[in-house]
Curated annotation (Swiss-Prot):
The modification N6-acetyllysine is found at K863. This is KAT8 regulatory NSL complex subunit 1-like protein. The keyword Lipid metabolism does not apply. The modification Phosphoserine is found at S463. GO terms for cellular component: H4 histone acetyltransferase complex; intracellular membrane-bounded organelle. There is a cross-link at K136 (Glycyl lysine isopeptide (Lys-Gly) (interchain with G-Cter in SUMO2)).
Length: 991
């Protein structure tokens, strides 16, 4: 761990940041990569990498000093200055030779060649000790040709080296490939130089022996120069690779450093932080589906204010300090990115990338632009949804019209049989037609004769045994069979969808909206097939009409279609539209099903499930709001269009206003602001230490159980009064004009003032809790509540089962068997036995007479009937005694009874004239006189029935058995009614 990180962990929060500009060029002034690795182990060099202020190290004099190498201020062509010291190898050779001007000219030419070929400028070669002048001589052709060869070799090597560097930057393998390529370039340069000198200098040496020593010296100088240039090139490539490697190490260290800074700061603050304050119940996050500003934006947009310790838990940490830390981190990371990525630098050769502007993380001081973008995106998404719905509806309408057209085209014609009229109707029609024809001219005089002739033939044909009727029935059956066979066998020109077999095979193919595919394809073929079926049916109908014998009367008659039998009917297809399936809260998929359905490797994290669950809940909540308010659409309406009264209703329903202080101390923070101030509400929630997204994850399970337990408790009247005043405070604060931030600030101020005296509130809370809580061991239940609920134990009732009992068999009495019962067949016994039946019959007769006279509205008859009933009851006992006394002389009984009746009638006429006498008893079989009297009475009734009144309807004649005279009529203004008992009723019934 770096010393800066150790200091950060020991001191607490101390954000150590790196400077915005790095002096990484100092690390390149080293001899080899080995020295880099050795010096990386030390602390000074590492601090130089990180940009900490340290004294600059002394540079090696034997190495080339590279100024501004690979720095952002460098140009596209690297400018390198070679500063040679007095101990260099080139100066040793200059001491031994006296040709200074020749070497200067050669060096100047070599400098120009190298500048044009490899873009490397050799500025000065300064000898320290030897300053003698040399003789100027022109360069020979061999040296110029050698310089050209050196230029070609350098150009090829430089291009190869550039390609190799690109490969190394892509594959990140520096040491293996570059070592081999460096050796390859060294050997190639040496071989090319030797070949040039052998070819060009060899023949000139023999011709000019005086200048051999000068040529050899020039060759050695050129070889040394070429060796130095190649070595410098190798060192340049190594420096470039080392720079890239150091930049990558620096980027890794910076990322690790800032990650550890943030991690250790959070670890330091978490023990001192309080648990994120959460209210008892908050409206669901999906009720107000607002956009959330990122924490970085909140950090940049926040002002330099001290955060309260009770709200967020950060101790003495200002927003400005964190802002400085964030700015330094972003600046350093962007600088490292520019060093590593070629697209992010200004030295890119691509024209398109030069025009690309790098987007910076600009602080958003006001969220108006962000909010405008979010609103624009919401409106655009709703517009696309509406267009998709309209296009889908148009497609469905077109599909339904196609199906309707297909159904109309494939609908067959219902063919009814002709009605067969009955024979009598046929005859009448034929007669009417004959009469109409007879009225015509004499030219058509033969038409009735022809119409009369088919009558016997038609009757013969309509008979069940006629051969024509049998042939007609056979023809009907054969026509039906051929129709069935034709319907089963599909014709060749029909489409596959119209045949029953293909429809079965294609039944499983359905469209997205539940309509069968066969119903929406091949409409032309179906219309042609339907026309073919219609033609076939019409041809069959014509054939049947030709074979069928018709009478001219059948065409004239018009009958109803419901009375005619069905001849043929084309069975139509059944189309079913499957209903659309909507998700309900019961049918929502579970978390396991959602995670198992997704197959991407990133679905293991709970963020995807949380986002999906939040979106599904928001969709269901929007549907509920649309049910409550008809002006709100679940899709087209924006979240800001949710009515405000719904917010308050859900708040009052869900928030426990009767809870304790710990539950209600953050009511102001949990309230969701109206839609126009959404950004400030989310910022306040982030400042208070929680966000709507991470809220369900932070809340622990015991705290939820504790809150649920507190909700179920009952508080006393004092607690209710305190909460009522608290609620009035809350209502007053809500009614004040101002933004949501002011409201939350007031509520937070109230919360802080309440938390200043926790001891008194804790004691009062404990007292209220002890008063309101129940002790399960000391609960007294009155007996009046327990008595009806007490269970009574039923007594055991023994069920009696049948048993066998012993029966003592006793012999039957013999004297009872010996005695024989003798039936008494005397008349007295029979009369006594039948007396009760006679009384019943008399009562029935009297009731019948009463109802008969009542229908005729006769009041006198009702009185007579009442008197008659009374007389019958009075003399019933006398009649019984008279029957017993006169059993031997049955013919004397009617006379005595008649005399009694006469006496009674006289007495009744004196007292009550409207009462009738009792009936006269009859002895059966009747005598001839009695039957003659009855017949005479009937004849008189028939004669006087039309003119007599209601009192003269029935007149009964009674005679005594001794005299054969007819009975006398009373002429005192009222007729004498006499009853003849059972005999009269029997005679009337017989008639």
């Amino acid at each position: 761990m770096t010393p800066a990180l150790k200091e950060a962990t020991t001191k607490g929060i101390c954000f150590s940041s790196l400077p915005n500009t790095m002096e990484s060029d100092k690390m390149l002034c080293m001899e080899s990569p080995r020295t880099v690795d050795e010096k990386l182990k030390g602390g000074d060099t590492f601090s130089q990498m990180l940009g900490f202020p340290t004294p600059e190290p002394t540079l090696n004099t034997n190495f080339v000093n590279l100024k501004h190498f690979a720095s952002p201020q460098a140009s596209k062509h690297f400018q390198t200055v070679l500063l040679m010291s007095s101990n260099s190898t080139l100066n040793k050779y200059n001491e031994n030779y006296n040709q200074k001007k020749v070497m200067e000219s050669n060096c100047s030419k070599l400098k120009n060649v190298l500048c044009n070929g490899s873009s490397i400028q050799l500025s000065k070669i300064c000898p320290s000790h030897s300053e003698n002048e040399f003789i100027k001589k022109e360069l020979s052709d061999t040296t110029s040709q050698c310089m050209k060869d050196i230029q070609i070799v350098l150009d090829s090597n430089l291009t190869k080296d550039a390609n190799v560097d690109r490969l190394h930057l892509q594959n990140c393998k520096w040491y293996q490939k570059n070592a081999l390529l460096d050796k390859f370039t060294d050997t190639k340069i040496k071989k090319g130089l030797l070949q040039c000198t052998q070819k060009k200098i060899g023949p000139s040496h023999s011709d000019v022996p005086t200048s051999s020593s000068a040529a050899e010296k020039e060759q050695e100088v050129n070889a040394r120069l070429l060796h130095c240039v190649s070595k410098q090139k190798i060192l340049l490539s190594q420096a470039r690779r080392t720079q890239k490697h150091l930049q990558m190490l620096l980027a890794k260290h910076v990322v690790k450093h800032y990650g550890q800074q943030m991690k250790f700061s959070m670890k330091h603050q978490l023990p001192t932080m309080k648990i994120f304050h959460e209210p008892t119940t908050v409206l669901s996050n999906s009720l107000l589906e607002h956009t959330e500003i990122k924490p970085e934006v909140n950090i940049l947009a926040s002002e330099n204010k001290f955060w309260d310790d009770t709200n967020n838990g950060f101790s003495q940490c200002t927003a400005a300090e964190i802002q400085r830390f964030a700015l330094s981190a972003t600046g350093l990371l962007s600088h490292v990115e520019e060093g590593l990525d070629s697209d992010a630098t200004d030295s890119s050769s691509d024209d398109e990338l030069d025009e690309y502007t790098i987007r910076k993380n600009v602080a958003v001081n006001s969220s108006t632009e962000w909010k405008w973008l979010v609103d624009r995106a919401q409106v655009g998404s709703r517009w696309t949804w509406l267009q998709a719905q309209i296009s889908e509806l148009e497609y469905k309408i077109q599909q339904l019209t196609d199906i309707h057209r297909q159904i109309r085209a494939s609908k067959g014609i219902v063919i009814l049989e002709e009605c067969q009229l009955p024979k009598d109707i046929l005859k009448k029609q034929i007669q009417f037609s004959n009469q109409a024809v007879s009225l015509n001219t004499s030219v058509n005089s033969q038409v009735p004769q022809r119409s009369e002739e088919p009558l016997p033939e038609h009757d013969f044909e309509m008979s069940p045994s006629s051969p024509t009727l049998l042939l007609r029935n056979i023809e009907k059956q054969s026509a039906q069979l051929t129709e069935i066979i034709n319907s089963l066998i599909a014709p060749l020109n029909l489409s596959p969808t119209s045949s029953p077999l293909s429809s079965k095979s294609c039944s499983h193919k359905c469209l997205a909206n539940g309509i069968s595919r066969s119903a929406s394809e091949n409409l032309d073929e179906l219309s042609s097939s339907s026309s073919w079926l219609l033609n076939q049916k019409h041809s069959k109908k014509r054939r049947k009409d030709r074979t069928r014998l018709k009478s001219p009367s059948l065409a004239i008659m018009s009958t109803a279609a419901r009375t005619r039998p069905l001849q043929s009917f084309h069975k139509r297809k059944l189309y079913r539209l499957s209903p659309t399936f909507y998700w309900t809260p019961e049918t929502l998929p579970s978390k396991e099903a959602f995670l198992s359905s997704t197959q991407t490797p990133y679905t293991g994290s709970p963020f995807s499930w949380d986002n999906w669950e939040q979106s599904s809940r928001s969709h269901l909540l929007r549907e509920q709001v649309s049910k409550l308010d008809s002006s709100f659409h679940p899709v087209l309406s924006l979240p800001s269009e949710i009515p405000l009264h719904l917010h308050f209703e859900t708040l009052f329903k869900k928030t426990d206003m009767k809870g304790e202080l710990a539950e209600n101390q953050f009511v102001g923070d949990c309230l969701i602001s109206p839609p126009p101030v959404q950004g400030t509400s989310s910022l306040n929630q982030w400042r208070n230490g929680y966000s709507p997204i991470c809220k369900p994850q932070i809340r622990s399970q015991p705290s939820v159980q504790l809150l649920q337990g507190r909700k179920k408790r009952h508080l006393s009247e004092t607690a209710l009064a305190g909460e009522r005043t608290r609620f009035e405070e809350f209502a007053f604060q809500r009614s004040e004009p101002g933004s949501h931030c002011n409201f939350t600030a007031v509520s937070n101020a109230n919360v802080t003032s309440r938390t200043q005296n926790p001891s008194s509130q804790n004691t009062s809370r404990r007292r209220l809790r002890s008063e309101s809580s129940y002790d399960i061991d000391n609960i007294v239940i009155p007996m009046s509540l327990v008595a009806p609920a007490k269970l009574e134990k039923l007594q055991y009732k023994e069920i009696l089962t049948p048993r066998w009992r012993k029966v003592v068999l006793q012999p039957l009495d013999e004297h009872n068997l010996n005695k024989e019962e003798i039936e008494d067949l005397s008349d007295d016994v029979f009369s006594l036995r039948h007396r009760k039946y006679e009384e019943r019959e008399q009562a029935r007769w009297s009731l019948w007479e009463q109802s008969k006279w009542h229908r005729r509205n006769n009041r006198a008859y009702s009185k007579n009937v009442e008197g008659q009933d009374l007389v019958l009851k009075e003399h019933s006992s006398e009649l019984g005694s008279a029957q017993q006394g006169t059993a031997e002389s049955p013919f004397e009984l009617p006379a005595e009874s008649h005399s009694l009746c006469a006496q009674d009638s006289l007495s009744l006429n004196d007292g009550q004239e409207d009462k009738s006498l009792r009936w006269e008893r009859r002895a059966f079989p009747l005598k001839d006189e009695d039957t003659a009297a009855l017949l005479c009475q009937d004849e008189r009734k028939d004669q006087t029935g039309g003119t007599s009144t209601a009192f003269h309807d029935e007149v009964f004649c009674s005679t005594t058995p001794e005299s054969g005279h007819p009975p006398k009529m009373q002429l005192d203004g009222m007729e004498e009614y006499k009853s003849f008992g059972i005999g009269v009723t029997n005679v009337k019934r017989n008639r």
